[in-house]
Amino acid sequence: SVMGKFDLSSAKIKERFVGDIHFDDDWQIGLIVGNSGTGKTTIAKELFPDSYVTNFEYKEESILDDFPKEVSIDQITRTFNSVGFSSPPSWLKPYSVLSNGQKMRVDLATSLLQDEALIVFDEFTSVVDREVAKIGSHAIQKAIRRTDKKFIAVGCHFDVEDWLLPDWIFNTMELFVVFVAYCLFHIL
């Protein structure tokens, strides 16, 4: 076993993060940012479990047909445009054939069209090139500020701060991480 190879006990290990997120009541955009493995997703899910954007299901031949019937085509296309997804030919394609950047924008539009007051979007701009990240961040920032919604981007790229213009930032690299173990470990 791996544990035996490194002379490790099978006792439970817990990792606890200690830190504070300070923000005023009137914020609209927040950013949780840090390197991989620093607890961003864990923190976001713990603090905002009901607002966490998960994978949406897109099954139709046209992305436009994946939205609820009570949402008008005009609302959908305005929201698409507001997040920088401004290609009518692409609106007619199924989600599965869209680029990662287009998928990110469709997911952002989908979350904006829901009745949720808070949107927590994990892996924000993680799978897109930095130019698409810049355009997408700026577009979502403008779209959110036109609403009464709150948006939290969770991601590993620090550059989005300049484009997203968050009201608050929580950098997980500044966390104090406490390891709690029920036994002592040593590696041979």
What is the predicted role of each segment?
Residues S1-D24:
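Pre-NBD coupling/linker segments of ABC/ABC-like ATPases
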Residues F17, I21-F85, C156-L164:
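ABC ATPase nucleotide-binding domain signature region
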Residues P94-S99:
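Conserved ABC ATPase signature
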Residues L108:
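Hydrophobic anchor residue at the start of the ABC signature
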Residues D115-A117:
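A residue-level structural signal marking coil residues immediately N-terminal to beta-strands
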Residues V120-D129:
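Walker B catalytic motif
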Residues V128-G136:
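Short alpha-helix in the ABC/ABC-like ATPase nucleotide-binding domain
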